[in-house]
């Protein structure tokens, strides 16, 4: 697992460092926590799919109806099902890796979190444990931290639609605004709002990367447009911290992303003249 760093120059924002964690999928969080501890971010943004609260296959937003895309989706469904069968055991909500990660992360920095498609069946017990851990779950809500307004929206598979009232209220704030949204494929819609920065995951970097290009992402299909990196200076897409499918990544390392907000451009230092 690597640490990937991006710097966003934004005159309206106070200087701030954000640790972006996506797609943990209940895997062992030790490496993630080590990277965050070393980076010392001001805020940790957890942008979806931390927990596994779904039924295999039903949460795959296929993105397009082409035969190739449908075949890839079918392969992912089978792979996820096999992984679930191998790991099937009685769930203990208070002992899971995802919740362990949240409890430890709050010791490093304030934690804000949004829901992804794998959290479709988040329970009241889950919400209570998340709140007890000190994590702020942003479910069409927002919170101010260090002068920046953080908001979060869930997967449309959780709600069925966008919460227009929240998006309008959130985006109208004069503060610098950071939105947690698991799905980068929502960006064409969300970009119409004056939101300064959107943090996403979901694509797992395109799963297989060839010459830096992701091959497939749920919700976008083959050769996805938004799969990893920074787009338009407003959208950051993480490759995520883990896999759900049994087949491995290729050319696509897992990562924790560190986003630094700077309100000044670097100064150019000219050589002294005599």
Describe the residue ranges of each PLM region.
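Active-site neighborhood of phospho(di)ester-bond hydrolases with catalytic His/Asp-centered motifs
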Residues: 19-22, 43-49, 110-117, 138-140, ...
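Beta-strand-turn-beta hairpins that frame and shape the catalytic cleft
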Residues: 7-19, 135, 142-152, 174, ...
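Conserved beta-sheet core of the metallophosphoesterase superfamily
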Residues: 184-260, 265-266
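Acidic, histidine-bearing metal-coordination/catalytic regions of metal-dependent phosphoesterases
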Residues: 1-27, 73
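Short active-site segment of divalent metal-dependent hydrolases/proteases
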Residues: 26, 51-52, 185, 205
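Non-catalytic terminal accessory segments
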Residues: 1-2, 266-269, 273
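Binuclear metal-dependent hydrolase catalytic cores centered on His/Asp/Glu-rich metal-binding motifs
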Residues: 124, 128-135, 141-181, 187-189, ...
